[in-house]
């Protein structure tokens, strides 16, 4: 599968889940912080790509990068799913896809 296909599928699932819980704006803010962390801290991506690092450690790193350790339950559960499915190497692309999806859906709502 292509990175874009996988990322978009997960991003749509996160958007639907956050929308169902009414937390899409909170998750959007956390996603923005996480996307910025990926850009500023290349070691974050390297850590996620490390197969020796346990999933629990990766979860803590991601939560710290997304909001100082305090993130919404929705984002945390999403990241747990990504780690469980061993798709963490696509997480940066999933987050960017989520931001784009929410941004374009908000823009469409304004029309």
Protein language model features and the residues they cover:
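Elongated, mostly alpha-helical coiled-coil "stalk/stator" tethers of large membrane protein machines
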Residues: 1-105
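A short, hydrophobic C-terminal helix/tail in secreted or cell-surface proteins
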Residues: 106-111
């Amino acid at each position: 599968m292509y990175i874009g296909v996988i990322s978009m599928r997960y991003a749509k699932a996160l958007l639907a889940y956050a929308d169902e819980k009414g937390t899409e704006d909170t998750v959007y803010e956390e996603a923005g912080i996480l996307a910025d962390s990926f850009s500023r801290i290349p070691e974050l991506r390297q850590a996620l790509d490390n197969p020796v690092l346990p999933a629990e450690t990766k979860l803590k790193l991601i939560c710290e990068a997304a909001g100082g350790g305090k993130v919404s339950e929705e984002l945390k559960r999403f990241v747990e799913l990504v780690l469980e499915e061993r798709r963490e190497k696509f997480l940066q692309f999933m987050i960017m896809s989520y931001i784009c999806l929410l941004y374009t859906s908000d823009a469409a709502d304004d029309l």
